[in-house]
Amino acid sequence: PDLEGSLMVELVLINMARLEQAYPPLILRFDDLSGQQVAARRLSAAEYLPRSLSADRPMPVDKAVSIKLAILDPGERALSYSVSVEQ
């Protein structure tokens, strides 16, 4: 990313259900070498969707949605990350 001290997280969401549904909240988590959480953040659809998509519209079926997030670097202790869909 253009900002010093930031990271770019890129992911693709695909709605594998048989019907359109709301874009889910995402949980972005960073862990240290021992698997302990260093940082985490819950992101609403309005926060992560690109400007070309609206959180007010449903997520289409079987369509890839590319997401790019510029976030602050959680520090050198954060050695791995995961993204999960909030249930």
Regions found by a protein language model. Name each.
Residues 13-18:
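Asparagine-centered strand-capping/turn motif at beta-strand->loop junctions
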Residues 28-32, 85:
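Conserved aromatic beta-strand anchor motif in extracellular beta-sandwich/beta-rich domains
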Residues 70-87:
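Short, surface-exposed ligand- or partner-binding patches at beta-edge/loop junctions that are enriched
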